[in-house]
Structure formats: structure tokens, C-alpha cells
């Protein structure tokens, strides 16, 4: 199988919360499947193999306490297709799990590419795989039970939030729910997270403009607002290119904003889309 993984740039930030306890979170950008990738993974009738896509970085992913990526495809079943209406083979999810990913973000502009059936099938496969997720839900009851997504590991409690700017004009079919960027909803979710006294609230935002190497005004304003409401760190996706990062300090507090991690697995050919970041966030307690 021909490997179509992107070039990876590795960055490490250590953010001190207060060193008796420590947790390492690893974030990657867009996990995509264009048609050339699907074709390259095809090994026999009805069978696909993606293991080589992650072979060079599997060890690094697995070393993190938590590895998180943006699943920017549906697992909507056959026929498998790339852009513009993504539906990846089920084997792709298994390869993602085998690579060491623990959590996938599902609120993005392609999560409804296969409509209600595709979104629900994606959720079903995530549930059966044991990979946790945030961003899309079969109904309101499931969202209330599962969101915000709380992670309890190494003595830490972390709340994970995920929202998207839109879904390419396709609307979620009731009772399905997609987390759209809406300040009223986000504020309620932040307050719900705060009530459980997490050590950190991390907002993963699918935002910005595609192929732009700088964040736009809306991204910057929303980032400021999120921090003001109590979000600790912000991780961005969607532009398919790397955008700047910021480390902000407020007294003894430190806040990371990653405006865009770029692509992680893709077959894009536009300028600057062939690079992405592995972002490692280390939190410590004294």
C-alpha cells in the first residue's frame, strides 16, 4: 500500500498548573480520506489496510496519556468516497484506534456528508470501537449524558468541548444534534463543565477560513471570549493549514491558543496543506 500521510511537525508545550501529578495530551489536526487515499488502502475485494499511514508516528501517539484528533470524515458505509462528501472505510477507524488515539472530535463541516444515517452510523462505530468522542449526538438525551466530555486520568479531571462553524449547508435531522458555534449554547456548556470543578476546560473549535495561514477576526474574538468565560486552552482546526499559536499569561495562569493544527492525514495539494502539527500539552500539579 502506498502511504499518503502528510509531513508532521512536532511541537511540545509544557503548561504548569501548579509536579506531583502530570498528564500529557496529544492533539492532531484533520484525519481525512480523499479518494486517492481510499484507493491506495484497497488491498483486496472489500478490504482496506491503513496501518502504514500511522506506522512512523504510532509510538509517539501511544506514549501520550490521551491522544485526540479531528475525524473529518463520516463512517457512512459504502460507497466509499472522498471529497466533497466523505465516507471512509470502517478499517480507517480501526487503524486510528490501533495508532493509539483515545478521543475523536466529530463536530466539523463534513460530519453530515452522509446525512442522518451516516452520522448515526459513525457514532455507532465509535461506540463499538471504544473510542470516546465529542461534537455529535444521536439525540438530546445522549448529549446530556455525554457532554461536556469529561476525562479522568492521572488524578486530573479535564472537560473537553467541541464545536463547528457549520456543516456545509446540510442541517442535522431531528433528533440528531451537532454542536454548532453558538455563544449561548457554549456558555451553558462551560458553566456545566465548571460545576464539576475540572482542572482544565479545553475547547476544540472547527473554525476559520480554509487555506488561510493567519486566523481571522472572528477566530481571535471568539478565542478571547472563550478565555473570558473560563476556557483554559483552545485547539483549532478547519483551515487545513497551520496557523499561529499563542501562549497567554494571566497572573499565575497560562493559556494556549492553537488556531489551526492543519492536516494530519490527507491528500490535499493546495499550498501549505501538506503539513500539520502534533501538539503535545503537558499539565502538571504541584
Report the location of each language-model feature:
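Positively charged n-region of N-terminal signal peptides that target proteins for export
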Residues: 1-5
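Acidic, metal/ion-coordinating pockets
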Residues: 19-286
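N-terminal signal peptide c-region/cleavage motif recognized by signal peptidases
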Residues: 14-16
Amino acid at each position: 500500500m502506498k502511504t499518503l500521510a502528510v509531513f508532521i511537525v512536532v511541537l511540545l508545550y509544557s503548561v504548569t498548573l501548579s509536579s506531583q501529578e502530570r498528564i500529557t495530551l496529544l492533539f492532531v489536526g484533520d484525519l481525512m480520506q480523499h479518494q486517492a487515499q481510499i484507493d491506495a488502502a484497497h488491498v483486496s475485494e472489500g478490504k482496506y489496510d491503513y496501518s502504514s499511514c500511522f506506522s512512523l508516528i504510532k509510538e509517539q501517539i501511544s506514549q501520550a496519556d490521551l491522544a485526540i484528533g479531528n475525524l473529518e470524515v463520516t463512517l457512512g458505509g459504502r460507497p466509499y468516497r472522498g471529497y466533497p462528501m466523505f465516507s471512509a472505510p470502517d478499517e480507517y477507524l480501526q487503524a486510528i484506534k490501533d495508532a493509539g488515539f483515545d478521543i475523536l472530535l466529530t463536530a466539523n463541516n463534513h460530519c453530515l456528508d452522509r446525512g442522518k444515517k451516516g452520522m448515526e452510523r459513525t457514532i455507532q462505530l465509535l461506540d463499538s470501537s471504544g473510542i470516546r468522542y465529542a461534537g455529535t449526538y444521536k439525540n438530546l438525551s445522549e448529549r446530556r449524558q455525554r457532554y461536556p466530555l469529561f476525562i479522568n486520568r492521572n488524578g486530573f479531571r479535564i472537560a473537553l468541548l467541541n464545536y463547528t462553524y457549520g456543516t456545509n449547508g446540510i442541517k442535522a435531522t431531528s433528533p440528531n444534534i451537532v454542536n454548532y458555534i453558538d455563544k449561548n449554547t457554549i456558555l451553558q456548556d462551560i458553566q456545566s463543565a465548571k460545576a464539576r470543578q475540572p482542572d482544565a476546560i479545553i475547547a476544540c473549535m472547527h473554525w476559520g477560513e480554509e487555506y488561510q495561514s493567519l486566523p481571522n477576526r472572528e477566530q481571535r474574538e471568539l478565542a478571547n471570549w472563550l478565555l473570558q468565560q473560563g476556557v483554559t486552552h483552545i485547539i483549532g482546526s478547519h483551515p487545513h493549514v497551520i496557523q499561529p499559536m499563542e501562549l497567554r499569561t494571566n497572573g499565575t495562569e497560562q493559556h494556549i491558543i492553537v488556531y489551526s493544527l492543519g492536516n494530519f492525514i490527507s491528500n490535499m495539494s493546495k499550498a501549505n496543506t501538506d503539513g500539520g502539527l502534533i501538539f503535545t500539552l503537558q499539565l502538571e500539579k504541584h
